[in-house]
Amino acid sequence: MAGLSRGSARALLAALLASTLLALLVSPARGRGGRDHGDWDEASRLPPLPPREDAARVARFVTHVSDWGALATISTLEAVRGRPFADVLSLSDGPPGAGSGVPYFYLSPLQLSVSNLQENPYATLTMTLAQTNFCKKHGFDPQSPLCVHIMLSGTVTKVNETEMDIAKHSLFIRHPEMKTWPSSHNWFFAKLNITNIWVLDYFGGPKIVTPEEYYNVTVQ
């Protein structure tokens, strides 16, 4: 009987541990950006997509709900000098519900993209709703234009002292882990100065939006 009791206790403990591990695996990660430092889509909190005919508003929407994007620069590495070089970077244009449209970054000189930007500040940033639950929920492939993505081109520069607090608040509220990154990496705040915008949200090719149209959108 004692052996049976010990066996039952072990079985119960194993079941409890298994259920706890499963809960950890399926629960949304915290501190990855988005509302409440979780996912924008948790509990259906992703705001509705603006009308597709309003390309400027769609562009602002994608920028605001994006926690990361792919930044393409021109490589300075000898092996691939002069070739396109893309890297994934975390970003934020402001606290949830209060986006400015300006993509801010937290960068280090140790990053290859930063070395490229020091020689040539021109870059193109791509952001897509594939990083949210929008495309999966509607059955859209990430390459489909219905799975909205945008391309912003311009120059990446360090933010000045007057903009430092805005960039810091915008990034740290969506990416709190950044606060713990090693200071020895000499992190600094930067932004994309947008000169050209393309919106791909439907079949027929990209729509062109001017920076003026983009920044004139009132985010609600």
Swiss-Prot record:
Glycans are attached at N160, N193, N216. It holds the Pfam family CREG_beta-barrel. SUPFAM superfamilies: FMN-binding split barrel. It comes from the Eukaryota. GO terms for molecular function: transcription corepressor activity. GO terms for biological process: autophagy; endocytosis; lysosomal lumen acidification; regulation of transcription by RNA polymerase II. It is found in: Secreted. Transmembrane segments: none annotated. Gene3D superfamilies: Electron Transport, Fmn-binding Protein, Chain A (2.30.110.10). One of its GO terms (cellular component) is extracellular region. May contribute to the transcriptional control of cell growth and differentiation. Antagonizes transcriptional activation and cellular transformation by the adenovirus E1A protein. The transcriptional control activity of cell growth requires interaction with IGF2R. Belongs to the CREG family. Homodimer. Interacts with IGF2R; the interaction is dependent on glycosylation. This is Protein CREG1. It comes from Homo sapiens.
